[in-house]
Amino acid sequence: MTKPIAVVIGATSKWQSDGRNTRMVHGGNIPDDELPLSIRWGVGGAIALKFAREGFHVVLTTRSKPNASALEAAIYSEGLDCMTVELDLESDDSISTAFETVRSELGDPEVVVLNAGYLEGRDLPPEMELLENMPVELFETAQNISSRGPFLVA
């Protein structure tokens, strides 16, 4: 019997030890081993680990495969199954290619978790925090990631 498949869209977090937002909040680099495994990759990583531990073959999606390498290694280290597929929610072709890869290598997913987010604009200078000051390009990207992309995934 094959394992059920869970695709986690947005499986990696921008709050990794070398991430821009981690440095912004904590004032410097934090070694990975100082971040507990349970929070190292944020909600997406926690969801991926949970599904893997429950017997699913987990597909980690991220815009760049290296972003998921540590999470993938952690899942493999527990003897669990996963694979990483590049997926950019702003690209129709990327979405199609990612799911073609999943289907050809594993089969149809039973679960798709939409966890992608977009942080830009949250760290605008205080004098620009109002929505009216947000550049239209940031708004369009946020809409593509949170609305249009998931629609295309479905």
What kind of region is each of these model predictions?
Residues 66, 86-98, 136:
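The beta1-alpha1 cofactor-binding region of Rossmann-like NAD(H)/NADP(H)-dependent oxidoreductases
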Residues 102-108:
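Glycine-rich phosphate-binding loop signature in dinucleotide/nucleotide-binding domains
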Residues 115-127:
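Conserved NAD(P)H cofactor-binding loop of Rossmann-fold oxidoreductase domains
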Residues 82-84:
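Hydrophobic/aromatic anchor residues within beta-strands of the central parallel beta-sheet
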